[in-house]
Amino acid sequence: GCPWRDLPASFGKFQAIYNCFNRWSKKGIIHNIFKILSADADKEWLMMDGSHIRAHQHSAGAAAHSGEDDHAIGISRGGATSKIHLIVDACGNPLEVIITAGNVNDVSIAPELIAAVDLAETEVVSADKGYDSDKLRAQIEEEGSKANIPYKRDREEKNKDMDWYLYKIRHLVENAFARLKHYRAIATRYDKLK
């Protein structure tokens, strides 16, 4: 990842590359390529989580042509951030990605993540306590899967139905974030494109 102006001249004019990328992004072409690549996923177990990404000063200060939500950059305790919400298969391969402002709660995006993935083959959906919600559990169970999400400490329900072995395998989603953040453009946001 680098600023658009720093692309090698052999690629062509940076404005043309930027316009092509932006056009493909708006038309959903990049998303469709991702969907085709993830078609043969092992969906027996799914894991989901969210991770913050710092927004570089160049992305946070660029002129806005549309609403703030279009750029998924929010202000939180760590400054300007974005958040990647990710659901991965049993092998740790990403199935669905949603990018929001950094101050968006995980559980508020989870229904959209679940709706974007076909749970017909899925036995268990695993997530951390940040996804503790009766509404989310009901959505997962309506799809025919089991929600393996621990209750928060302040809830009366106990975690007697938890499969702690599968919960430990949830590290696959953390590993996916680690792999993604090896790429400079993902570890730090450099532009306002969503």
Predicted regions and their residues:
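Short alpha-helical elements
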Residues: 1-194
